[in-house]
Amino acid sequence: MFHGKHPEGLSERGRALLLEGGKALGLDLKPHLEAFSRLYALLQEASGKVNLTALRGEEEVVVKHFLDSLTLLRLPLWQGPLRVLDLGTGAGFPGLPLKIVRPELELVLVDATRKKVAFVERAIEVLGLKGARALWGRAEVLAREAGHREAYDRAVARAVAPLCVLSELLLPFLEVGGAAVAMKGPRVEEELAPLPPALERLGGRLGEVLALQLPLSGEARHLVVLEKAAPTPPAYPRRPGVPERYPLC
């Protein structure tokens, strides 16, 4: 896909960190080094023009964007040509790293900021990621459209909103039998306690909650699985902004 050395991409140290972190996750990232290096270069190129991410240092990007995104693969949810939604993708995380390592996934990356969507579109094009597309819009609107409502096998969101809000935004996108993963930091217990009744209203239930450490940094992370057990009632999601202002729990 790429040829020759890209001096604007990952340094030798950055590549070594990525390989080491991947190994800690049980992943061989050597075949994907050039793609991650080019993605890093694209982030650096765009950072002066668009406020994509607060993380710009090489080690920060490798650990807190690339490897953090790939912690999703610790869950046994990604086998086969699944249709996956990345909600609130920002600069393409976790969706782009997930797609690089699992190219068979059909991926839709959604964000409500047009400039971020434009960046993700460019990254998809430059990296040659077939079966991936970026989409501008709000979850509350898209989840009511025929091509999106109950149309996905998996959905993911990283640091978008509290679980009570995320549940209402994610579950309507899932087919019955599908699963969403909310990527959370060290403190998740307070969000989990009131969640089950809200999930039941949405046709969901709480699945696995996987505690893990971010490779290289040791920071605590939690992957919260929300399972789609029944169709989501037509009333959900509510109008844009309402889930945040009046969460279900």
UniProtKB/Swiss-Prot annotation:
Binding residues for S-adenosyl-L-methionine: G88, F93, D111, A112, T113, A139, E140, R158
Keywords: Cytoplasm, Methyltransferase, rRNA processing, S-adenosyl-L-methionine, Transferase
InterPro entries given in the database record: rRNA_ssu_MeTfrase_G, SAM-dependent_MTases_sf
Gene3D superfamilies per record: Vaccinia Virus protein VP39 (3.40.50.150)
Enzyme class: transferase
GO CC field: cytosol
Location relative to the cell: Cytoplasm
S-S bonds: none
Domain of life: Bacteria
GO molecular function, one term: rRNA (guanine-N7-)-methyltransferase activity
Function: Specifically methylates the N7 position of a guanine in 16S rRNA.
Family, per entry: Belongs to the methyltransferase superfamily. RNA methyltransferase RsmG family.
Protein name, per record: Ribosomal RNA small subunit methyltransferase G
Organism encoding this protein: Thermus thermophilus (strain ATCC BAA-163 / DSM 7039 / HB27)
